[in-house]
């Protein structure tokens, strides 16, 4: 055996693969092993390779092969196996049982078997699609100093789902005692990446777990597939159908067949039952219906790519008795501004009285007023000017008229700012409820209904949030005997429209379509919305140890990059309601006018009371004195 040339070939292969650790299973003599190791440790090589020799002679049991011989913490460990050894077949069979022909091990299987013999040996082995297995066939050259090594790429698209062994010639190396060089290519493998050469799964039938909630599972598979394939009524089972259509695109990219496994829920608990449980126990290779990537699931699954958006909300119209606001006419200014403005008006009222007094006492008779107004009258003039009211009394002096000019100017500025703020407030969208969180909703007196979705019930059962526990106690447990607690999305949305104050909990991908169907644009803007649960992204999942992980990730990225994913998502997933308030006129309701009318009524009552007091005062306390002769 030309061990020096073989050592050079192995070292060159490790350099090209960027691997620095190798375990060599061999049946050489001690001096041959020493010669091979000496060639490894020569300083002419560009890298230092950690190597470990395992003598296969005398090993009767290869059980726990990975645990006993391949323990490592490296991303990839190289494994050399001399398949000419008698014990090599038992070792390779055990590796197949333990499913370690995968991307974490770089296998170099060296022998001189023909391709047909190698196919017969490996046809039954469980070699994965991500396997990094190379069969190396050696042939000694005529000059006896160089050895030719033909390298073949070996993989299987999936033995347990119908895949066949694939052995493709890659290239040929010629090695002498000093160096190795590539002499020729045996195929076009080098023109593409590893997964570029393995992207077509024409010989396998992928098992795909799919959720169907809007149709009974008693229907035939063809009927369920026909329902999921439809493109109308996107609000019915939209998440499941969105994922199903993405899976059909993946099927076309991989040129494979698919067998769909149907279930009526994502899972019974976090990782048991449903489509998620099917992937966890490896009865399915992929989930077509996107699901949440929870902490418990990520122990068994890998999230490949984001393929959905999960959003549950509570919508309701503001109750008629919840929108009365008495402070809308005071909001433009803070209390301090109102106090200062009142003080300025009072000061001007005093200055006006002083002005009128001086004009009556000091000016010429032809310029004097007919009478001196009281201090109360000047206060009334001042506050009337603030309300854009004129006055029958006008100062005749230059100073008095300057006071009037300042009064009307400041009143004009304040009035215009005040009216602009009030009008914009009154003509904006009608008053919204102050309920913004689940805690406030649970503490309110509003009636609640829910859409009967499995993940909503699961969230109520397993959520640890205190506001959800309070919501269950006050809104759910009190209605356990109410048959209308769980309502279909269409009925729930119609009840929200008919009953202000009725709260309906639904998933946006299904419920928003009914809202847009039954509500006008103005009514949509009037709706209150409370987030039922934190917004979550949905992912397509594979088993954590799935050999298709990288291939599927690359294919889904291709779907994302070409814009196909965005098109499908915009068609199937409704993210938000569109409120276009500028397209209609909003009328001012009683929630704003009622406080104003109440203020006017109170003022009228006060005026009548004052009038009665004045009449009584005049009648009983200001009687004319009777003079007797």
From Swiss-Prot:
Q: Is Transmembrane one of the keywords UniProt gives this record?
A: yes
| Tissues expressing the protein | Expressed in neurons in the antennal coeloconic 2 (ac2) sensillum class of sensory hairs (at protein level).
Q: How does it sit in the membrane?
A: Multi-pass membrane protein
Topological domain (Cytoplasmic) residues are 357-374, 424-592
Q: Name one GO molecular function term.
A: extracellular ligand-gated monoatomic ion channel activity
Query: Could you tell me the superkingdom of the organism this chain comes from?
Result: Eukaryota
Q: Where in the cell is it found?
A: Cell membrane; Cell projection, Dendrite
Primary site of residence? membrane
Q: Which UniProt keywords apply?
A: Cell membrane, Cell projection, Glycoprotein, Membrane, Olfaction, Receptor, Sensory transduction, Transmembrane, Transmembrane helix
Q: What does this protein do?
A: Olfactory receptor for propionic, butyric and 2-oxopentanoic acids.
Q: Which family does it belong to?
A: Belongs to the glutamate-gated ion channel (TC 1.A.10.1) family.
Q: Which PANTHER family match?
A: IONOTROPIC RECEPTOR 20A-RELATED (PTHR42643), IONOTROPIC RECEPTOR 31A, ISOFORM C-RELATED (PTHR42643:SF32)
- What protein am I looking at? Ionotropic receptor 75a
